[in-house]
Amino acid sequence: MDKEKLIAPNQMGYLILKDDGNLLDSGGDLKNDDRSANVIMGLLNLTDSIDEDFMPNSSCERITIDYDQHYYSICMSNRRIYVVKLSKTHTQNGATTSSSSSTSYNDAAEGNNISSSTVLA
């Protein structure tokens, strides 16, 4: 995976989408993964249809999709959708570890800076 796009030691892959769902960049497990991009866009479109009476004054800032071995962190900034697939554990010197990290993705082409905090248990 491109070292400039690696935002966490436990990162498995990433997608960068335009707000209309078109794939701009990808890497790792998500390299050219149009299917995942379509599923994520469907999920984001679903969040737009939440009844205001059910959740007044709420806006979704980040979505996390949690699986046993990994999770996806999805956020939007400057009309771009950033998706990162992260392993719940990673190995260092052959030992499986848990970690707490703060991550930042810099999109040099657009001057965007996406940050998130991750705690792994």
UniProtKB/Swiss-Prot annotation:
Residues 91-121 are annotated as: Disordered. GO terms for cellular component: lysosome; Ragulator complex. GO terms for molecular function: guanyl-nucleotide exchange factor activity. Residues 112-121 have a biased composition (Polar residues). Keywords: Lysosome. InterPro entries: LAMTOR4. It is found in: Lysosome. Disulfide bonds: none annotated. One of its GO terms (biological process) is regulation of cell size. Regulator of the TOR pathway, a signaling cascade that promotes cell growth in response to growth factors, energy levels, and amino acids. As part of the Ragulator complex, may activate the TOR signaling cascade in response to amino acids. Part of the Ragulator complex. Belongs to the LAMTOR4 family. This is Ragulator complex protein LAMTOR4 homolog.
